């Protein structure tokens, strides 16, 4: 049994402005939630989005530190995704109007580990490095090895 919690960000400003789920982390104890779910022998994962157009390095670090705290509460794995706007969403409209989408942007090719936006507070190269470091730091070796086995080999 598995459940993945859509925390998205540890920053209320980011959640309120960009996230569709609007999970209010200030209204409950997420660590307690994870510990409670674990009592029922359910694996718990979380999803985080980083690299919003106006997200600062400090806000990204806050989200990563939050994920580390959740790992201390028994979290089994954390997924870190770089923002990839989907057509029809408010963030896609914003990024289109404000020049954040590269000319070759293709939403049909989901590349969650690649920086998909330009003109962000944190550079594309740094975002990719931060995301990779966060994924490696916040996940157990067993989960990382399992994920590697899922990768499709190209012909």
Model region roles, listed by residue range:
Residues 1-153:
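A structural motif corresponding to the C-terminal lobe/cap of the Radical SAM core domain
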């Amino acid at each position: 049994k598995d459940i993945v919690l859509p925390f998205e960000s540890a920053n209320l400003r980011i959640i309120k402005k960009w996230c569709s789920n609007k999970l209010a982390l200030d209204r409950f104890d997420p660590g307690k939630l994870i510990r409670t779910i674990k009592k029922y022998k359910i694996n718990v994962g979380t999803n985080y989005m980083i690299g919003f157009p106006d997200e600062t390095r400090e806000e990204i670090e806050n989200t990563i530190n939050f994920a580390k705290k959740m790992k201390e509460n028994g979290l089994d794995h954390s997924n870190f995704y770089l923002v990839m706007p989907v057509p029809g969403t408010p963030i896609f409209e914003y990024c289109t109007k404000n020049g954040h989408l590269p000319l070759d942007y293709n939403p049909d090719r989901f590349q969650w580990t690649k920086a998909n936006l330009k003109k962000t507070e944190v550079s594309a190269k740094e975002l990719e490095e931060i995301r990779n470091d966060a994924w490696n730091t916040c996940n157990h070796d067993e989960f990382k090895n399992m994920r590697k086995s899922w990768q499709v080999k190209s012909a």
